[in-house]
Each structure stands twice: as structure tokens, then as C-alpha cells.
């Protein structure tokens, strides 16, 4: 038995002497195969050697750069090459019920004193920078994890018993954070409050980077491992590392192999930082290596799986049991509401023939008569210079001009052409009659015999001017109402927008009523994810998350191409849950 132990020790010594200068896995071609070792319970642990190699690799890096051994929890990039859970991340514990006033330095000192050497500590905080009472601690060796579970679980800290669980892959911490709708930053930056990462336009507008990758990078949830496919079979891990080192600091490169140890033409590369992995996608996706185009994307383990996936979100807006809906009666198959049908009926003949003000919908402005004061404005032309009738100009300047410019665009409005003959006559009455100065040329043929009567009319017309002045403000208030009705009832591609009113009116009508305001959003939700979420309601022109001091305020706006899409979003998206938060969706009246 002693001889067997000696031979086993000799074999172990020989295996350690044959390790390469740069520690790598024993699966790389050219490296000698190491004999499996047995653990204390007799179970063979074939990966113990690779674990020790990786630890020695981290030890070497820590001498030159202290940040090299700062692990990024929950990114799963340490073990993404093989999908195994054994590696440096196995030495981590999740701690809850921490006093809210406790700092991460105090937790580190406590664990180092009671347990052993600590390599990483992180306390999670909410968007306001307040402690959530939980965090993670990572130890240098695995035996410290067992010791922490034995000695520190239920340890009384400032009157609160600590709850400690082993968390090798970060699942316990991830579930705790998902319940609160937050995410981690993966470094001590989260200890001073979490927030969205500001990315340069070169990343945000890069067509080679998928939107979900950008949003996860902004929120600090993205890992640092990429997956490379369609590699030439002669490409080894050294060549893979050499190539991708152009994009950043490569911590590990692996080639996927079959059971015979031959390359499968794919591999993974783990970088020091997540942004380097994103840069590698931008630089190398589609590029040729040995005449073969590489397919580069984020490794599946580096992208968090959230509860707002596209296939889940599509079914969440429909009533339970309903598989789908057909086309509605509105433009593009959108459902049309009863209120739209009623307004269309009131508007009368406002259709493809144009906006004729004499149509049944408006009742003919010229025929409104004394009720509104438009009666026969042409007949008042000769009285333009008398008394208060001159104030009739305020109706044109104050009411008609302001409301028309506000609701129909600021372009030149041809009254006689754009609004039919009724407004044409109104235009001649106002402009030709009222705008003139007092003088014989404008007074018309007034006989001397009626001068007394006409002077007496000054009082009457003065009072009439005051009435028209008050009517001016009424028309000013009526302007937005007409504009709001028109934008919902008139097809912007047909009708009067193709006429003399010009493009200003089309732009104006296209921008009102098509923006929504969304509240109670998760604080880690990005504008890209918000846009993607609401794209199923219609074409999204713009999406924005309201920010304050670089942090999300939990609300945002989405602007659609049409008002119908905005109304649809209010109907089917209001009340749904995103990351456990029930959102409130309504039309943005301030747009």
C-alpha cells in the first residue's frame, strides 16, 4: 500500500512538472494528459488540476495588477467556456439581513477576522443609494466558504442575525435582486449606488451590436465572454487569443473539442471587461480568419435571461386563453374606437374631397349668421373705418391667425384657396375692409344726408367691436379643439393635406396625440428595451427614459408614427408588468 502511495505521488509530481508556463486547461492539444485525482470522499475530481491552474494564473496576475483578481459576480464568464460551475466563482457566499448602515469595508474586515482571506465584497444598493441589506463575499479558498457557513450563519451583527448561503454561480443573489427589480454593477461601483452606464454613440449606433447587448451593457448586467463560430479547424486557443487580443485584454480562450480531442470549429473568449467583449463583436464579426468568416456574438451565459423576453411580452398583452387577434377597421389593421366613429360622423364631409368649410360638418362659416357674428361680413366693407368696427381686425389677428398657425402650421395660408368660397369672402371682408385706415377711399359712397345716422352708428359698431373682441378669445380657445378633432378624423395621406395648406399642416397633425407617457418603469430599463417593448403596438419614432443626475426616474415617453398606435399602446400595455412592476401608460398631453 505504501508503494502504491509513492507511485501515485511520483505520478502527481511528474504531472506538475509538465505544466506549461502559462496555465491552461488539460484539453488543449499538445499538453500531456494529467491523471485524475481523488477527493477526500473517494470521488474523482478531474477538474481539480484546472482549478489550481486558474488560481495560480490569478495569483500571477495579482502581482502586476491588483484589479486582476477582482471577480465580477454573476457574469458567469469564469466558467462559460465549458458550462461547468466549478471554478473561481465557487468560493462565494450570499449574505442577507445585513444592517442597513453597514459598509462593505466592515463586512470585509469581519469576514477576514472570523473566516479567512477575502478577495471580493459587494453590497447591493437601490437606485437612491440605500443599502438593500444583502451582498456577496468571495473568499480565496473553498474551505473558507465552509467555515463561513459553519461559523457566520446566524451570527449576530448589530442585533441582526446574518443569513449566509453558498452561492457558487450567483443564483441566490440574482433571485434576490430580481424580486426587487434591480440589477448589479459587478464591481464596487454598486456600493456607491447603481445607475445606467453612459455609452458613446459609436456603441449605441453600431449596427453590428444587437440592441439587447447594448441595453444589458448599459445596465451593467452583461458578461465578458463571447462565442466564436465557423473557425478554421487548425485554429487553436493560442491563435484565438492572439487574434482577439486586438480588442482587449483576453483572460481566457478556449476551443470546443469533440470526444476525440479535435476542434469543432468554435470557441469562447473571455475578456477583462464586458465592453471589450462588445468591441470584439464589432471588430471581428464577419471578418475572415484563414479564409473563413467568423461569427462572433455574446456567449449565452454572458447575457442575463430577464422576465421581459420578446416571446413572453407578446402573450402578456392578450387576455388569457386568446391566441391572437385579426385586423381591425382602422389604418393598417389597427382597431378603431367608437369615439373615432362618432367624431367622424359629426365632421360630415371632411373626407377625400378636402376641407370645405361650407360642408355639413361646419355648417358653413358664412351661414353662421348673427349667432357668431359672421352674418354678412361683406356688407360691412364700407363701414371699415367707423368706430369699433376697426377692432374687428383683432378677430383676424388675435384669434384666427394664432389658432390657425398653432393648429394648421405656420406656412402661408391662402384663405380664399384653402377654406373654400366662404372663407374667401371672409378674407376679403377682413383684409380688404377692416385693415384699412380711416379715409374716404375706404368709407365707400356715403351720402351727406345720412352722416348723422352714420355717426350714430359709431356707438352701435363700437359695441359690436367689443363683442367681436370677446369672440376673438373664443375663437382662440376654439382653435386647438378644431385641431384636435381634425388630427383624429382626417387621413393625413388624403384630404386637405394634399391641397394648398402645405407641409406645415401635415407635420403639425402628425406630431399631436401620438406620444405616450409611461410611469413606474424599472430603474434599470433602458430606452432601447422600452422601444422594443412598445414596437409591437406600432412603429416607434422615439423612446426616452427620463433621467436625473444620470439615473433613471422610473418613467419615460414613447412617440409613435400615428395616433392610432399610441391609443393602442394605452389599451394593451397599461397595467402589464415589467420586471415585476406594473406600468402606467397614458397619452402624453404635454407633447
Swiss-Prot record:
Modified residues (Phosphoserine): 422
Protein name: Myelin expression factor 2
One GO CC annotation: nucleus
Molecular function GO terms recorded: DNA-binding transcription repressor activity, RNA polymerase II-specific; RNA binding; RNA polymerase II cis-regulatory region sequence-specific DNA binding
Subunit structure: Monomer.
Position of the Glycyl lysine isopeptide (Lys-Gly) (interchain with G-Cter in SUMO2) cross-link: 44
Gene3D superfamilies documented for this protein: 3.30.70.330
The organism of origin for this protein: Mus musculus (Mouse)
Tissue: Highly expressed in the brain.
Composition-biased stretches (Basic and acidic residues): 22-36, 45-63, 74-87
Highest rank taxon of the organism: Eukaryota
PANTHER family xref list: RNA RECOGNITION MOTIF RRM DOMAIN CONTAINING PROTEIN
Annotated compartments: Nucleus
Keyword tags: DNA-binding, Isopeptide bond, Methylation, Nucleus, Phosphoprotein, Repeat, Repressor, RNA-binding, Transcription, Ubl conjugation
Residues modified to Omega-N-methylarginine: 397, 417
Annotated region (Disordered), positions in chain: 1-92
